[in-house]
C-alpha cells in the first residue's frame, strides 16, 4: 500500500500482541495426528473424492496454485466449469494495485457468473480465489475408527494451501447454488469470485467501482465466504495500518555519544503505541467494546541500522491495528497524540504515515437466519471493500450481508492448513439454508 497522510512528529515505544478470543479454540490437525494412507487406502480416498462433485471440485481448485497476483489459472478453470454448468460468466481484469489506469494484468481477473436466464442476481455469493504463499500441494490424511479400522468418511482430512482460505468456501458456494437451481431454475442467484483479497482487496474494490455494482443495487443479499467454523459471523474488527519512522544521526559505535540511535529512539515510541489497547479511553487509549473486546495492535515489521558498529541513523516499523470500536478518524487522532507525546518526551525526529485506503471501523453483519451458532471474529475480510449503494434506502430495504464458511481461521495461512470432509459437506447445507432464507425474504418484499 502507498501512504497518503504524512505527519512529522517525534516519538518512542514497544508492543505485545493480544490473542483472538472470540473464536472457539481449535488446534490445527497436524500430520502426526492422522495416518498417511497406504496404496490401498489412497485408492479408497481418491474414489471418495472423485465420486463427490463437491470434493472433486475442491481438489481441482486447490491443486491450482493461485497466490495473489497469479490467480489466472484458477480463474480460467472456474470460467470453464461454470460455463459448462449453464452460467453466463464475465471476467473483470484487475491490475496488481487496483488502479485501472495502469496496464491490466490478464493473469488476475474477477469471475462474475449468473444463470443465463437471470442476468441481474438478487442474491450474490462471493469468496476470494487468491491465497497467501507458499503453495502447499493438496493431500489427504486418514483418521480411522479405532475399533474397526474402517474409513470415517466425514473425518477425512484435506490439506493444502487454500483448502480453508478460501477455496473451501468457493467450492461449497458453487455446489450450494447448483443444488438450489436444480429445484428452482429461475432463482436469481450470482457468484462473484475476486482476486487480491489477501493483498488489499483489489478485486472487490474493482467490482465495487464497476457497472456491475449498480445504484441502487439489484441484489438484496450478499453471502461472503470465509473460514468461520460453519458459524454465522455477527461482525469483525476494523482495521487501520500505519508506519512509524525515526531519523537519528550516524556515528562510530565506539563513540555513540557523537550520534543519535534511531533504533533506541523508536523502541519507547513503539512501546507507547503498543499500550494504547490497554489504556482507558478517558486517558487517551483506543476503544474496546463488549462485542469485540479490546483494540489490539501488532508491530508486524521493524527495520533499522546498517551494521553493528554504526549508530543507526534510521529505523521504522509497520503496525496493524484491529479496531474494537469507534471510528478510524478517532483512532488516528489517538495514535497521533500518543506519538506526539512520546516524541516530545524523547525529542525524537519522527514521521507517521497512515496507509492509503483509510482503514475501516468494526463491521457489523446480519445473523437473522435461524439454525446457526453465532460468533464475532478479529480478522479482516472483503466485506468493507464492497461498496453497497443502499444508503438512501429505508432500513428494511438495505442489503443483507452474511459471513459464513467451512474451516477454522486458526489453520488458515499455516503449514497445516486443512479441513475435514464433514466441514465441507456441512457448509454446503449451511449455504443452502442462507440462500433459501434470502429467497424467501426477497419474495416478501
UniProtKB/Swiss-Prot annotation:
Its EC number(s):
3.4.17.-
The active site annotation covers 197
Identify the keywords attached in UniProt to this record, alphabetized.
Hydrolase, Metal-binding, Protease, Secreted, Signal, Zinc
- Protein location: Secreted
The residues forming the signal peptide are: 1-17
Superkingdom is Eukaryota
Question: GO cellular component terms?
Answer: extracellular region
Residues annotated for Zn(2+) 1 binding in this entry: 165, 198
The keyword Signal is assigned to this record:
yes
The protein in question is named: Probable carboxypeptidase UREG_07869
* Organism of derivation: Uncinocarpus reesii (strain UAMH 1704)
